[in-house]
C-alpha cells in the first residue's frame, strides 16, 4: 500500500467503525456472569490473541492475497517491475479492498465476545450502521471514482479479485463463529 492508502485505512475506514463499537449496548447476558476479578486487566492476553493472532491472521492473509491474485491473473511473473503501472494500482486497490472487507466482517464479529454475530440484533446500534456506510462509501470512492483513484493511486478492481478475497473474509467469519460456539459450550460445562 502507498502511504496515503495506509492513512485511508487508519483514519478513514478503521476509525469510525471502531468508535461505533464503543457505543455498542452491553451484552444482554452481562449480568448473568460473575464479576471480573479486581486484578484482571481489561485488555488481557486472551483478548490480544483473539484480536491480533486469530482474527488478525485472516485479515493479514486476505490483503496480500488480493494483491498477488490481481498480479498473477494478469500474467505477472516474479521479478517483473510493476510499481506505478495500472496493474500495480489495481493490485494495491485490491489489497485495500481486502482490508476493508475484513474490517466489515470483524466489526460484526466483535460486537460480542461470545454471542454469535447472528444472535446480536442487527439494528441495535445505529452508529455502527452509519460508520459502515461511511467506510463502504470511502472504499467505493477510492476504488471506483476517477478523483479517488487519482488521489489514492488506485485503479478499479475486477470482479474476479473481489470474489477471490471473499472466501478469506467468510473463513474469518466462520472461524470466529466456531470459536464463539466452543467458548459458549465451555462456559455451560463449568
Could you say what each language-model-derived stretch is?
Residues 1-190:
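C-terminal transmembrane helices and immediately adjacent loops/tails
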Amino acid at each position: 500500500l502507498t502511504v496515503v492508502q495506509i492513512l485511508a485505512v487508519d483514519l478513514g475506514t478503521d476509525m469510525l467503525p471502531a468508535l461505533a463499537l464503543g457505543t455498542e449496548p452491553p451484552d444482554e447476558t452481562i449480568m448473568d456472569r460473575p464479576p471480573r476479578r479486581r486484578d484482571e486487566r481489561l485488555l488481557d492476553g486472551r483478548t490480544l490473541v483473539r484480536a491480533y493472532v486469530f482474527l488478525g491472521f485472516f485479515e493479514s492473509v486476505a490483503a496480500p492475497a488480493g494483491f498477488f491474485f490481481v498480479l498473477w491473473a494478469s500474467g505477472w511473473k516474479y521479478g517483473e517491475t510493476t510499481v506505478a503501472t495500472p496493474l500495480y494500482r489495481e493490485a494495491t486497490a485490491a489489497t485495500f479492498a481486502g482490508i476493508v472487507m475484513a474490517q466489515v466482517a470483524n466489526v460484526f464479529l466483535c460486537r460480542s465476545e461470545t454471542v454469535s454475530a447472528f444472535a446480536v440484533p442487527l439494528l441495535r446500534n445505529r452508529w455502527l450502521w452509519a460508520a459502515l456506510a461511511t467506510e463502504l462509501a470511502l472504499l467505493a470512492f477510492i476504488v471506483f471514482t476517477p478523483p479517488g483513484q487519482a488521489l489514492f493511486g488506485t485503479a478499479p478492481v475486477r470482479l474476479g479479485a473481489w470474489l477471490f478475497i471473499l472466501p478469506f473474509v467468510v473463513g474469518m467469519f466462520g472461524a470466529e463463529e466456531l470459536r464463539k460456539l466452543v467458548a459458549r459450550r465451555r462456559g455451560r460445562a463449568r
